[in-house]
């Protein structure tokens, strides 16, 4: 029987797999490599991790789902992508880990059908709708997967390393780790 508990476990399990992907693809890179922009847009790996922490985990779970204030966001344009020289790679990774821990507490303590505590008026202009935690989880799974893929491409440009994701599909159509 498929239950709400099982649904939450599946969604959170897949989100966790993508979060691990982010950490895994960056493992072994030097501080210089983590800060080196390789694409024309100018972002770098540490900036992506900070973006995942602030614009994704913090914003979607702490602000949207739990209703916390949005005044945490850096005031400068694209501030969530900026990593100062005084911020170490470990600081940025720890920030992301802390936001994941806080997000998980919100996810496990909130009903999947619960509406957002703090909807964002910008969603309409984005053509998006997030009526409940379930839709936010699906959005975050997509966002984190996309950004993990961006990091894959940059890592391959840095040193040729690739992150190969292999999943098998069970007879019920649910992905299972191999």
What is each PLM-predicted segment?
Residues 8-27, 31-79, 120-178:
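Short, contiguous alpha-helical
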Residues 80-120, 132-145:
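Acidic/histidine-rich alpha-helical segments that form the ligand environment
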Residues 1-7:
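Short, contiguous pre-domain boundary segments
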């Amino acid at each position: 029987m498929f239950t709400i508990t099982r649904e939450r476990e599946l969604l959170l399990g897949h989100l966790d797999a993508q979060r691990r992907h982010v950490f895994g693809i960056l493992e072994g890179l030097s501080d210089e490599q983590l800060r080196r922009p390789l694409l024309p847009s100018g972002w770098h790996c540490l900036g992506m991790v900070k973006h995942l922490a602030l614009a994704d985990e913090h914003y979607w779970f702490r602000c949207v789902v739990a209703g916390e204030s949005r005044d945490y966001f850096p005031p400068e344009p694209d501030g969530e992508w900026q990593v100062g020289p005084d911020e170490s790679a470990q600081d940025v990774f720890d920030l992301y880990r802390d936001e994941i821990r806080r997000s998980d507490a919100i996810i496990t303590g909130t009903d999947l059908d619960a509406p957002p505590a703090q909807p964002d008026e910008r969603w309409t202009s984005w053509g998006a709708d997030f009526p409940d935690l379930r839709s936010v989880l699906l959005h975050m799974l997509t966002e984190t997967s996309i950004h993990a893929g961006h990091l894959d491409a940059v890592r391959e440009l840095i040193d040729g390393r690739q992150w190969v994701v292999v999943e098998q599909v069970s007879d019920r159509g649910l992905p299972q780790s191999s």
